[in-house]
């Protein structure tokens, strides 16, 4: 089976339909680590509080510790239905709190029994799985009996099997990539007969890849017929929606900014036309002249990531590279190092292009433009998340790049202007 390899590449009707207004606030309990004393400043349109959802006291206490007071618009629409066990299909742009919808909903419904797995969360990369596990840890901090484990390829499967067969270490919540989870099912090492919640995050990426979809179908068949199914993504094409709904029964469908505008709150977007040979000098100039907390620089291949990172380090820039060709443990260690602010600059392939939440990133640079417009959304969405400001700059070095830039502007009805010669005022993209 090659789904693990697919992850490595990473360039890989009676339902109720609700269109949430595109001016929804960009905050709420989402997937980034926030200091406990830092209060979320964005308020939902209806000023609903999390207490209105009648969540468990333990959950409300954890939400309060994170500094969240009001749910985002997506959370206001989804959570009241999802905590009742309704199937959910949700598409909303980055930073609107989709992760917290399924984390809070599944924890609300969870009644932990030793040795029984009741919640299954599938995602397409190891970093995202690791991050979701951390979200469960944050929101279940006052639920000491709840155990969550993450399973992904690149480490010996024997360790996973050992955890699963011991009632004391077997988790109630499993977060996993499709390849490793399918392997555990094939080995009969994991029992899914008690699963009550089946979640796929970034579901379009999981279900568009044929190998991953087959794995998910096999896993799905090993779970009970009666269960809740929830799927989430920042992009859901008209073609993939029917595929998602085949797993569901009369789902609540939420489409925010339905294939329309790229309106990432507070994100300034520019492009720079230059030749390939000019990219390194211009990048160094930008890193010297721009103010930023952390920056992520996207390139199109692992070899370019390594070479650019070497160049930056040699030029005394605090840089680190993260890409899918690295050994698994090193990749996770580098991700953690960047997230914990040990490095301010990260050079990455699209392994960081979807779902990864690092709150301090407020500058995203496309050293190489992506091939697809949707991938641009996921990349630049790393900056300006959670109601913060941000800046995105794309290098345009070829006719093909110009065509992609046109597609991005057309696809999302957004005007991306040329980066001014005099630069930009830091107050437009830096939080004061």
UniProtKB/Swiss-Prot annotation:
Helicase C-terminal domain ranges (all copies): 266-427
One Pfam family, short name: DEAD
Helicase ATP-binding domain boundaries: 79-254
Annotated stretches, region: Disordered: 1-35
Gene name in the database record: SUB2
UniProt free text on domains: The Q motif is unique to and characteristic of the DEAD box family of RNA helicases and controls ATP binding and hydrolysis.
Family that this chain belongs to: Belongs to the DEAD box helicase family. DECD subfamily.
Motif (DEAD box): 201-204
Motif Q motif per UniProt: ranges: 48-76
Residue ranges with Acidic residues bias: 1-17
Alphabetic keyword roster: ATP-binding, Helicase, Hydrolase, mRNA processing, mRNA splicing, mRNA transport, Nucleotide-binding, Nucleus, RNA-binding, Spliceosome, Transport
GO BP, sorted A to Z: mRNA processing; mRNA transport; RNA splicing
Binding site for ATP: 92-99
Places the protein is found: Nucleus
GO molecular function: ATP binding; ATP hydrolysis activity; RNA binding; RNA helicase activity
An annotated GO cellular component: spliceosomal complex
Its job: ATP-binding RNA helicase involved in transcription elongation and required for the export of mRNA out of the nucleus. SUB2 also plays a role in pre-mRNA splicing and spliceosome assembly. May be involved in rDNA and telomeric silencing, and maintenance of genome integrity.
EC code(s) of this entry: 3.6.4.13
Catalysed reactions listed for this entry: ATP + H2O = ADP + phosphate + H(+)
Protein name per UniProt: ATP-dependent RNA helicase SUB2
